[in-house]
Amino acid sequence: MKRVFLVTFLVLVSTFLLGATKEIVFWHSYSTTSGEYELLTKDIIPTFEKSHPGIKVTEVQVPSDEMRRRLIVSTAAAQYPDVMRMDIIWVPQFADIGVLMPVDKEFAQDFAKLKGTFLPGPLSTNYWKGNYYGLPLDTNTRVLLWNKKLFQAAGLKQPPTTMDEFIKDIKLLTKDTNKDGQIDQWGFADNGFGPWNTIPWIYSFGGKILDDTNSKALGYVNSAQSVEALKTFKDLYQQGYMAPIGGGGIGTLEGYAEGVYAMIFEGPWAWSIIKGQYPDAEINFALVPAGKGGSKSVVGGEDIVLFKSTKYKAEAWEFAKYMTSKEVQLKFAGIGQMPVLKGLLNEPVIKNHPFFGIYLQQLETAVARSPHPAWNEINDIMDSAWQNSVVGGIDPKKALDDAAAQIEKVLKNYK
């Protein structure tokens, strides 16, 4: 009789505990063949569930090229995951339509404690109209890659640290090495005219795209500093000191590795791509040269967001916090994902890494691509303005005046 009672009791307890478990669904785009996916599914989630026995995390992998379509379908059906790893550009877009949870409002005390632990650039990508709609999860930026052999051949010992030195070195390192009358070595190369490429120029020169509230372009995108950045870039390009962009030539990473380009701006993925094709290539990193605005670069990456529709907001928040914890951030750093927390430069996994240190240092001052729901439109306007000036010959001030007017029209829809 006692045995029957005990078995019945255990069944009831198990049923109760099973019923009490709260399932949260986490969308992400980590490739199922990646180290990040293996870490997430075999370590991060199981460890979280073990320390939070009442929570079950169901991860759903959505390929990155399908994610936006899935989100749009979810919007139409009003069916969202609880938590998502979201591209930083999308956060203000989905915050603006009211589907994301303002975490600084819902979890005010927790957020106040966490806010100061994040790198400012990645954190800013979650901000829209007075609230934060997520936490930074992983990040990246662009730094200067310089070819030491080409520098030494030109009598230069160190990479440039200022914009003046940068411009001087670009000119010095552009050469016709085989004396056939054609330039075959360029001081600098890049692969586009959009803000991802040009923000290091604009902001290091002291310019901006939008004001601090992301509601005004006039006087910022066409400020004297922004115009100077475009004019400098245009002059270098038209005078032949920068490699042609979009002309079907050698790619920036290949050109850097092969000694065709002395300097490029590139992200942390450059290491694996270059080493994969050129195992013996020497790669040297430095901060973006500082101008009147300091050493500034652009922020990339993903945030972790909660949807308002979640039934388990407290549990979803616990998982989001866990994903941004020092423990988890360092685990991901160990397989190549850039962390978002301050104060990690002396951690062994960072200190002993060939390039994380310089990227984290750059991220201390890196700026987001103006967090705004209409960023894609703003991006295209800026891309066209720079391209029309650099390649098309339009005066830099006119190009940016026109861009400012176009962006102002876009911004009016969000005031």
Show where each model-derived region lies.
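Paired acidic/hydrophobic, glycine-rich loop segments that form the ligand-binding mouth/hinge
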Residues: 82-85, 262-266
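Conserved N-terminal structural module of periplasmic/extracytoplasmic solute-binding proteins
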Residues: 18-99, 108-115, 158, 245-246, ...
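Hinge/lid segment of periplasmic solute-binding proteins
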Residues: 63, 88-143, 167, 183-184, ...
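Hydrophobic residues within well-ordered alpha-helices
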Residues: 71, 166, 173, 202, ...
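C-terminal lobe and pocket-closing loops
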Residues: 108, 269-280, 291-384, 414
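Glycine-centered hinge/linker elements that transmit conformational signals in sensory
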Residues: 169-174, 215-245, 288
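Short, solvent-exposed loop/beta-turn-alpha elements that line the ligand-binding surface or hinge
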Residues: 104-118, 178-188, 207-228, 276-277, ...
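Periplasmic solute-binding protein
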Residues: 91-99, 104, 119-158, 190-215, ...
